[in-house]
Amino acid sequence: MKEKESLFMHTTFIALIALVLLTGCGRRGRQGSYNDSTAVVQVPIEQLMLPDTAFASADAVKYVVENTDSVATPLRDLDDRYDDSCRVMTFRKNLMRNADFGGRVQGTPTTIEVAWEFSTDRDTTHTSHGVWGGGTGWTGQPLYAKWTDEEMQAFRSSGALTADFGREELFVASLCGKGYFINFETGKLSRQKLDLGNVIKGTPSLDPDFMNLYVGQGVARKGGAMGCEAFDLLKHQRTFYFGPDPKAWRNWSAFDSSPVVVGGYLFWPGENGTLYKYERRQGELRRVSVMRYRVRGVAPGIESCLCVYRNYGYFGDNHGNIICVNLNTMRPVWYYDNHDDSDGTVVCCEEDGVPYVYTACEVDRQGEEGICYFVKLNGLNGTRVWERQIPCKRVELTGKSLDGGMYSTPLLGLGDCTDLVFVNLCRNGADHVMGQLMALSTADGTIRYAVNYKEFAWSSPIPFLNENNELFVLACDAAGNVRLVQGKTGKVVCQTCMGSNFESSPIAVGNTAVVGCRGGKIYKFVIK
């Protein structure tokens, strides 16, 4: 891609901050309640930016920042372009990764029914990490969009639409290396499938401003190269690819992380120990800055997704490092050692004007037995508020090691459960339990209850609210079970079993959920 001058003028401007509680689009309010009013306050962006500081803990992070341009590239605004949309354009929907997807049910549901199922291709290629087949893996979340008339007309010029193209569309990236556009109503292919080049394990991302689709590759076929790519949806073509980075401090160029746009820039963490910052145009990306880092002499990979509060970005990595980065400068603000591999994405919630982040680790480097450390941290300085230690094990399954702990991303409670945080865990035989949906107090980390599974669970839970503001949590496990749990009590109100591993995380649209499995299928469920 040709080098170009900065895409936008960097000038002083005013940020528009909309303090909005939940609406029909499913926007998350600070307390998780309903309110149709919207308060709009104009505040200079300089007053909203969090300070460019570095706490003593950040000294543990040895880093370099490389800038392409001689001019600074500060964030242009602090808008959450994802939370303000009814679309699901990235993993867990918004920048804070705490969104209400918009799942709604009536009363207390009693059934989970299959509306349709979609079959993916199957890839039998032997890679350095085995045969991946089809369906979806971890995190594998679908994307969802409801297009306008103008957008639908623009897509027609691509020549890629099928007879089943419609207003509501899903996109799923598969382990088989193909990308599928699916009609949300019918479950039929709505565009020609995309060739994504390699195994895709993570969740892609739709650009909230341009018709760009971003996809990170997870495993290379036949020992070839892998990296990250962008597709121009108006052309239905790949228009950007970035493979192995010769300057990376870690030699593994996978990108399982789902990138996000913050302040006009695309931020994309890599498993090569690097955080990338790009300028975007239609079909184009231009790198403007990178941060490369080591902790204790090691450059770990980032499989989790970037969680963002204002100009601070939070992520965990393969060595349990939890790092806060100022996205204006790409410099670390604080660091927290959470002991072990942290692939689950950090989630954030503002309480009394202060951001707090929640995350937990796996039992990987600890050995066959260890602790999943679930923590709540102050997002401004990294100070620990509480820690819950949950015993877990690492086990061998059909010749492969299955780490214990948290692979999923926590769900912050809504409605009548704003005092709870929910998480799927892999106990792997610790306390005689394989998997659990656990509900913890956000105040002190006390375990309120746990729903036991007969298999482990990597899939992230999602919320549904009824007309009485009661929360129901939908959670999947590796045995193919889909459960709807009453958030307040832990009672399983209904469930179904598809018999295939749900590693992937679902999305909610109205009273439906869409999720893929390792068995080559994508399912749409209706909750009644």
Language-model features: where?
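Bacterial N-terminal signal peptides that target proteins for export
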Residues: K2-F13
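N-terminal capping/interface segment
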Residues: I14-A15, S289
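C-terminal motif of bacterial Sec signal peptides marking the signal peptidase cleavage site
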Residues: L22-G24
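Short glycine/Trp-rich loop-beta-loop segment that forms part of the substrate-binding cleft
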Residues: V88
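Extracytoplasmic/lumenal domain signature
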Residues: Q31-D77, R81-D83, N98-W138, L143-V215, ...
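Short polar catalytic/cofactor-binding loops
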Residues: R92-M96
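Bacterial signal peptide processing site
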Residues: G26-R28
